[in-house]
């Protein structure tokens, strides 16, 4: 997750206000993640990385990740109705194998995930429009085998996208929330 329009806002505000706004949003968003069984891996400036299916196994991790993403987007849209400083989120989700564990040195060690799966999720987030959720075809395939409520969520094919640093493109889908939008086609 990354806040799409945070840098221009941060340029206009005092540092204390920037920290307060970020911390307020992080408190709200990370509670959604933890309630869904996600692991908050790290906060990086105006974004954060979440793991599902590690460190705790979850058979429906793709559904949990998408439901969390939808809940976070809903929360941001709702918060923007009453807050002076409006933010947008960009969320990229990809599923696959990753190197997961304690990585670092004796001075600084972090439990984290690294590898192509992590990089692909980040690259998906980078091509998102504000308030958009993009998922890879790998995540989409897992969702089709899990219990995601098709009455509230649809997946819109976005075609094959070339992501920075990858030798070949990947099929991408946007996640549309029928609670926020009426312009969508149900998931098949």
What residue spans do the PLM features occupy?
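Catalytic NTP-binding/metal-coordinating core of nucleotidyl cyclase/transferase enzymes
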Residues: 1-67
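Helical mechanochemical/support elements of P-loop NTPase systems and associated helical scaffolds
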Residues: 18, 25, 44, 61, ...
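Catalytic core regions of nucleotide second-messenger enzymes
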Residues: 36-37, 41-44, 74-92, 161-163, ...
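Cytosolic nucleotide-binding catalytic cores of signal-transduction proteins
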Residues: 46-47, 69-78, 105, 114, ...
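Catalytic strand-loop-helix junctions within cyclic-nucleotide turnover domains
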Residues: 51-61, 91-110, 130-131
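Catalytic/regulatory signature loops of cyclic-dinucleotide turnover enzymes
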Residues: 79-80, 94, 116-141
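Cytosolic regulatory/linker segments at or just downstream of nucleotide-handling modules
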Residues: 98, 127-188
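Short, surface-exposed loop/helix-turn segments at secondary-structure junctions
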Residues: 103-115, 148-154
